[in-house]
């Protein structure tokens, strides 16, 4: 008999039921579980997957460039970046009636088009791309790079070129490559591109391959560099009257320390950004060489960890044994990487609006809303993934004997204290915040709004004041005219920063008040609850006091239901899916607070948020309802507008989200009955019964059903929530 799929598992391929299909999909990338898998082959497969993923990323970015060059309006937008709406691509849809054709014909396009909200137009403009030919060249170049990575992935699976296990486990060399090579050299390349191409373009010049070596980025060339007079390069900065993309008001400085924003583009000065990338390059290139590689100089990470035993004795064996624990567990390494990447992605969301690096992106409000929403949701999924792989590490890779007495073992020994403290914090934040909101709602409902509990966030205001925001009147550190740092900031370093901080038209230091206080604590409640569920799920992944080590009891991973001792209670997967529920809710609050804060700032009516965000009816009425009018009329019996696709997504998102509960709540018996009923009906229906299948239909397991439920819940939630801030902004500002 021919071997059926999945070829990775002989046992599963011989399963006569539909379990073969679903388990085959579920374990397709679980290389560890595949037949005949060795540790070396596992590392090689993952390495090849990395190269394949990079190939897909470069192909995707190539497609962005190509479609904008082909169907976009980049050259028209460069002439008027504040008023011409950027086109992502054309829409060809046979279902479009004349009202839809007219509604979607925007941005100077010849027919229906999609408007681009990811900020790529602003990015390409900032880095010096000025023509469609530039975009085509970039698309073709990235297509070549994508092909190279695809070939590299295939090549490194061939026995002759496949790296050995020792190569993968050489942590010092990997850090050297990642820190110095990827971060350091790429930052240096970025600084070089800004200095040689982007900054000259912003000053009305034009540098391409033909004149790259002859066009000096500074009038004095390399003279000051060789003479050690580096300060020369920072003199003669662009003036406040500089018109971007022209020589009017332009200076000659390359790396600067000006601070603040370019008055016209409302983005940080390009010369400041070049200086930043140069500094990052120096730091990371040095950092990557602090570890011992082939040359016998620098630190051994293993040696440093083994020697790190705190003298007080309160941390037991300290970090002994951690090097081997981490270096031999891909799940531990992935957990650390995902935790770091998740935090960085959330920071990107925050910096996209507070320090908008690309020219004119700060004035494209819908793009700001889209980028913030996108990056916060991505960050949430990545961070929950960190906990998931931490739990898998404990389940599959952790050896209590090898790590006995070190810091990781002590964390596990203290897990009851960790979980109970997180529980206390979550309960405190949740009940007090809800109490504040409900009290304020009742006071307004009873006609006594003056009896609301309004709390000024004085600690946060003090921190903002210490950094230079003078409007609160704290007169402390950088907000005090008598402070030495204040005076130094006016002349020596970042002279434009304090002006930017005190400018209420940007988002650098948003003014905060009593409306921000409860929503901040609501978000804190959500964050702590998510962390509580994830931490408990990971820390209890192997067992609890009831069941000391689940791994030794022969149970399947992750959970065998209440009938066999209640192991679902100590299942990381069963903690993971309610944690994703909480993560999505929390980011919903984060995103909607950000959006209301900014939409009132952009419209010039910040008092609306200040007055209405202190009670729940204010949120429902003055934010949700008030900003939904154009959206809920995206399509109606009288016609359609350009928000109709978002209106449809909003409705469809609710349906997908609700479908998720159908999988999350019922148990396996319900599904088995439903499937057998459907199968029986199918086999007795004329024509339909001509289609047969070889596998006996069986219900999804609890774990699989929860995965299907979680996928629907997550996708539906994001379709519902993201389809509010983005189009409601577009309806007001385009």
From Swiss-Prot:
Residues binding chlorophyll a B3: 662, 670
Gene3D superfamilies named in the record: Photosystem I PsaA/PsaB
Gene Ontology BP term (one): photosynthesis
Enzyme class, broadest EC rank: oxidoreductase
Record-annotated disulphide pairs: none
Binding residues for phylloquinone: 671
Reactions performed catalytically: reduced [plastocyanin] + hnu + oxidized [2Fe-2S]-[ferredoxin] = oxidized [plastocyanin] + reduced [2Fe-2S]-[ferredoxin]
Top-level division of the source organism's lineage: Eukaryota
GO MF annotation list: 4 iron, 4 sulfur cluster binding; chlorophyll binding; electron transfer activity; magnesium ion binding; oxidoreductase activity
Classification via SUPFAM superfamilies: Photosystem I subunits PsaA/PsaB
Co-factor binding comment: P700 is a chlorophyll a/chlorophyll a' dimer, A0 is one or more chlorophyll a, A1 is one or both phylloquinones and FX is a shared 4Fe-4S iron-sulfur center.
EC number(s) stated in the UniProt entry for this protein: 1.97.1.12
Main location: plastid
Keywords per UniProt: 4Fe-4S, Chlorophyll, Chloroplast, Chromophore, Electron transport, Iron, Iron-sulfur, Magnesium, Membrane, Metal-binding, Oxidoreductase, Photosynthesis, Photosystem I, Plastid, Thylakoid, Transmembrane, Transmembrane helix, Transport
Compartments it resides in: Plastid, Chloroplast thylakoid membrane
HAMAP family for this protein: PSI_PsaB (MF_00482)
Record's subunit section: The PsaA/B heterodimer binds the P700 chlorophyll special pair and subsequent electron acceptors. PSI consists of a core antenna complex that captures photons, and an electron transfer chain that converts photonic excitation into a charge separation. The eukaryotic PSI reaction center is composed of at least 11 subunits.
Role played: PsaA and PsaB bind P700, the primary electron donor of photosystem I (PSI), as well as the electron acceptors A0, A1 and FX. PSI is a plastocyanin-ferredoxin oxidoreductase, converting photonic excitation into a charge separation, which transfers an electron from the donor P700 chlorophyll pair to the spectroscopically characterized acceptors A0, A1, FX, FA and FB in turn. Oxidized P700 is reduced on the lumenal side of the thylakoid membrane by plastocyanin.
Family: Belongs to the PsaA/PsaB family.
PANTHER family: OUTER MEMBRANE PROTEIN, OMPA-RELATED (PTHR30128), PHOTOSYSTEM I P700 CHLOROPHYLL A APOPROTEIN A1-RELATED (PTHR30128:SF19)
Annotated protein name in UniProt: Photosystem I P700 chlorophyll a apoprotein A2
Source taxonomy: Eukaryota, Viridiplantae, Streptophyta, Embryophyta, Tracheophyta
């Amino acid at each position: 008999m021919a071997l059926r799929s999945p070829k990775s598992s002989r046992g599963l391929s011989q399963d006569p039921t539909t379990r073969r299909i679903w388990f085959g999909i579920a374990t397709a990338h679980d290389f560890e579980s595949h037949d005949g898998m060795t540790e070396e082959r596992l590392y090689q497969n993952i390495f090849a997957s990395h190269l394949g993923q990079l190939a897909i990323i470069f192909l995707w970015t190539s497609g962005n460039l190509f479609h904008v060059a082909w169907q976009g309006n980049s050259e028209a937008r460069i002439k008027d970046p504040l008023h011409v709406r950027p086109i992502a691509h054309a829409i060809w849809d046979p279902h479009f009636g004349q009202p839809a054709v007219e509604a979607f014909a925007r941005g100077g396009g010849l027919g229906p088009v999609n408007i681009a909200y990811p900020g790529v137009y602003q990015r390409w403009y900032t880095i010096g791309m000025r023509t469609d030919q530039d975009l085509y060249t970039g698309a073709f170049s990235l297509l070549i790079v994508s092909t190279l990575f695809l070939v590299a992935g295939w090549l490194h699976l061939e026995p002759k070129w496949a790296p050995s296990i020792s190569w993968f486990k050489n942590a010092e060399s990997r850090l050297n490559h990642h820190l110095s090579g990827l971060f350091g050299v790429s930052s240096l390349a970025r600084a070089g591109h800004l200095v040689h191409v982007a900054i000259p373009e912003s000053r009305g010049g034009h540098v391409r391959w033909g004149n790259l070596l002859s066009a000096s980025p500074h009038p004095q060339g390399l003279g000051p560099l060789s003479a050690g007079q580096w300060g020369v390069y920072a003199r003669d900065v662009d003036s406040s009257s500089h018109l971007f993309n022209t020589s009017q008001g332009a200076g000659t400085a390359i790396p600067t320390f000006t601070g603040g924003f370019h008055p016209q583009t409302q983005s940080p000065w390009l010369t400041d950004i070049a200086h930043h990338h140069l500094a990052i390059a120096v730091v990371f290139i040095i950092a990557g060489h602090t570890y011992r590689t082939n040359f016998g100089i620098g630190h051994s990470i293993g040696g440093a960890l083994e020697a790190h035993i705190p003298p007080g004795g309160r941390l037991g064996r300290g970090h002994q044994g951690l090097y081997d624990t981490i270096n031999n567990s891909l799940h531990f390494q992935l957990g650390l990487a995902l935790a770091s990447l998740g935090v960085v992605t959330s920071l990107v969301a925050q910096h996209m609006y507070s320090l908008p690096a690309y020219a004119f992106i700060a004035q494209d409000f819908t793009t700001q809303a889209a980028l913030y929403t996108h990056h916060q949701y991505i960050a949430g999924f990545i961070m929950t993934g960190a906990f998931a792989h931490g739990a898998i590490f404990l389940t599959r890779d952790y050896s209590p004997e090898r790590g006995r007495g070190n810091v990781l073992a002590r964390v596990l020994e203290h897990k009851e204290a960790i979980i109970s403290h997180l529980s206390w914090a979550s309960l405190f934040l949740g009940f007090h915040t809800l109490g504040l909101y409900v009290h304020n709602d009742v006071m307004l409902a009873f006609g006594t709004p003056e009896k609301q509990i309004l709390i000024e966030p004085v600690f946060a205001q003090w921190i903002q004041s210490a950094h230079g925001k003078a409007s609160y009147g704290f007169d402390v550190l950088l907000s005090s005219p008598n402070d030495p740092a204040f005076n130094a900031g006016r002349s020596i370093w970042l002279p434009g920063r304090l002006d930017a901080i005190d400018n209420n038209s940007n988002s650098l230091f948003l003014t905060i008040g009593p409306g921000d206080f409860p929503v901040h604590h609501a978000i804190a409640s959500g964050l702590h609850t998510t962390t509580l569920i994830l931490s408990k799920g990971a820390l209890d992944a192997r067992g609890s006091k009831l069941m000391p080590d689940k791994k030794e009891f022969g149970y399947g991973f992750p959970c065998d239901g209440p009938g066999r001792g209640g192991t679902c209670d100590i299942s990381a997967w069963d903690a993971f899916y309610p944690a994703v529920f909480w993560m999505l809710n929390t980011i919903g609050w984060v995103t909607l607070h950000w959006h209301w804060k900014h939409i009132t700032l952009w419209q010039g009516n910040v008092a609306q948020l200040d007055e209405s965000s202190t009670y729940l009816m204010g949120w429902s009425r003055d934010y949700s309802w008030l900003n939904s009018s154009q959206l809920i009329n995206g399509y109606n019996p009288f016609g359609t507008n350009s928000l109709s696709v978002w209106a449809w997504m909003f409705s469809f998102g609710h349906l997908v989200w609700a479908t998720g509960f159908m999988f999350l709540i019922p148990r396996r018996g319900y599904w088995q009955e439903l499937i057998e009923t459907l199968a029986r009906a199918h086999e007795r229906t004329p024509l339909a019964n001509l289609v047969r299948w070889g596998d006996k239909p069986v219900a999804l397991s609890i774990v699989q059903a929860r995965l299907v439920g979680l996928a629907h819940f997550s996708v539906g939630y994001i379709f519902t929530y993201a389809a509010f801030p983005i189009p409601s902004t577009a309806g007001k500002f385009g």
